[in-house]
Amino acid sequence: MKKYDPTRYSSAVGEAWMHTSFKTKFTHEIFDIKEVREYCLNLFKEAFNRYKIECRKIGFDSNHVHMMIDLGNYSRPQAAKMLKGYTAKKLLQKFPLIKKKYFWGSGLWSPAYYMYSVGKDMQFMESYIMKQKYSLDNIVQLKLNSFVHATGL
C-alpha cells in the first residue's frame, strides 16, 4: 500500500487537487497555432514554478486548456487569477497581432473558469485531460527531459 505523503507548507499540510479549465475570451481557437500553444505551455510551467503549484497533467484544445493542479494554500479564485493573469499578460505581449485581431485590446481568458475538486476520480479526470487535442503528460517529467536535453546527459 502506498504511503500518503501530503504536501507540507509553513502552516498547513495537505493537497487540493483540482481539474481546472480556462477558456479563451470569445472562444477564439488560438491554440491551433503551434507556436502560441507551446509558448502558453511554457508560461504555465513558469507560473507553476513561480507560485509553487504542482501540475500533473495539462492538455490544450483549440480554445481552452485543461489541467490537473494542486492548489496548495491558494483558494480557487486566487489560483485562477494568478495563472490566468500571468499567462495572459506575457502571451499577449509576445503576440501583439493576436491581441489586436482576436481580443481587441482586452484579456486573453474568459472571466469564467472551471475548477472541480478531484478525489477518487483522479484517474478518470487525468484520462479526460490526456484526450484533449494537444495534451502533455507529467509536467515534472517534461522538466527533467528538458534538463537532460539541455545538459546533454
Task: Name each model feature, range by range.
Residues 1-153:
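Basic nucleic-acid-binding interfaces
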